[in-house]
Structure formats: structure tokens, C-alpha cells
């Protein structure tokens, strides 16, 4: 859930955070990543069978990168990514799946800054977004992924028409927060996850309040 992660905006903050960590956990390993300000975060779920990679969905976050993906509002399909960027995302996922020799579900988190795609992390497992994409698309993704892990090929499911999404318009994953149950928790969103659940909304157009609301917060 992003526990222990911090965003530092200058060298002094980096030094302060590092010292605080070392004071609490002497000898602890620390990972420093470059933070891309005002970047767009992307979640990609896919299923790999060793021969091909099926991208079940590319989700674009409304909140800027830096907010934990579990606390972000995600839109399926993406609403402002160019065809070129989406093609790059697809190629990166395929290359990662091949390098990892992935079989079954693979989640890749990325950010896009100035039309350049960066990979944050790749997880060869089910992610929290799989149920969202499955419900949004009407495709039994967990079942298909399980059968693929047991040896079946994606081509079999494609021939049966099982990989075709029936989503019309957009599906929006909205985080649910239980601030009333945890009043002591700061309400500012950041790299540590604070949501306790998720809801899904289906909209026909991006003028819908479900899409516009996060921009107004």
C-alpha cells in the first residue's frame, strides 16, 4: 500500500527523509526514484500465455502521478492518450511479459510525461484492478487467466469470442474512503494508500459528473 513512501521536492527534504528512516531503521535499504511532476499514471492489466499477450485494459488515472493507485480515480479506456502512446504501452507490456516469461496475469504500472512512457513496476500477479476491468468489460478475466496458467492458450478463448469487451462509453473506478471511521488519518492523498474500497460507475461521455468531479477537488 505504499507504506513508508515519501515525495521529496528538494535535496533538503531528501536528506531529512533519509535521515528519519535511518534513525528508525539503522542499516535499512532505501530506494530513491526520480519523481515526474504533473505526469499521467497508467495501470495495465494483461494475460500472457507464453505465445501472446492480451491487454485486458489500459486505465488512465485522473489524479496526477504520486497519488497511490488505490486512491486514484481510474478511467477505462484511457481518455487522453494518443494512439502512439498506447502503442508504446502495448509494446512495453509485451516486452516485459517476454522478459519475465510471464504466464497468467501481469500488471504493469507506468507514467506518461511529455508523451514519453516510463515503467514504474511490473507485478506478475492479480492486481486490485482485475475485478474492475472484468466487471467493466464483461469478460471473466480471472477464469481465463487461471486456465491460461494451467496450459490453455489465449487463441482458444479468442476463437470463442470470449476476449471481446462489451463496454460502451467509459467505466470509472472510484476510491471509497472511510474518513469517519479513521478521523485521525490525514486526508491528503499521496503515495500511501488510504482508501478502504472501490466503486464503479459507467458513463456515456466525459461530461458526466463522475468524470468531472475529481478535477474539481
Feature annotation, model-predicted:
Residues 1-217:
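ATP-dependent carboxylate activation and anion-phosphoryl transfer catalytic cores
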Amino acid at each position: 500500500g505504499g507504506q513508508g513512501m515519501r515525495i521529496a521536492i528538494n535535496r533538503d527534504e531528501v536528506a531529512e527523509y533519509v535521515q528519519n528512516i535511518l534513525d528508525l531503521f539503522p542499516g535499512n535499504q532505501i530506494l530513491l526514484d526520480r519523481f515526474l511532476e504533473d505526469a499521467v499514471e497508467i495501470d495495465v492489466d494483461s494475460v500472457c500465455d507464453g505465445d501472446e499477450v492480451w491487454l485486458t485494459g489500459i486505465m488512465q488515472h485522473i489524479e496526477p502521478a504520486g497519488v497511490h493507485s488505490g486512491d486514484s480515480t481510474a478511467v477505462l479506456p484511457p481518455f487522453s492518450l494518443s494512439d502512439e502512446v498506447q502503442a508504446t504501452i502495448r509494446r512495453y507490456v509485451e516486452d516485459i511479459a517476454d522478459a519475465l516469461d510471464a504466464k497468467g496475469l501481469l500488471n504493469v504500472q507506468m507514467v506518461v510525461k511529455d508523451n514519453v512512457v516510463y515503467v514504474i513496476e511490473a507485478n506478475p500477479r492479480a492486481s486490485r484492478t482485475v475485478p474492475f476491468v472484468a466487471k467493466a468489460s464483461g469478460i471473466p478475466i480471472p477464469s481465463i487467466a487461471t486456465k491460461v496458467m494451467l496450459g490453455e492458450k489465449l487463441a482458444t478463448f479468442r476463437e470463442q469470442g470470449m476476449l471481446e469487451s462489451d463496454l460502451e462509453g467509459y467505466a470509472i473506478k472510484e476510491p471509497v474512503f472511510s474518513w469517519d471511521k479513521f478521523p485521525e488519518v490525514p486526508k491528503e492523498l499521496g503515495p500511501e494508500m488510504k482508501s478502504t474500497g472501490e466503486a464503479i460507475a459507467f458513463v456515456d461521455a466525459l461530461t458526466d459528473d463522475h468524470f468531472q468531479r475529481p478535477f474539481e477537488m
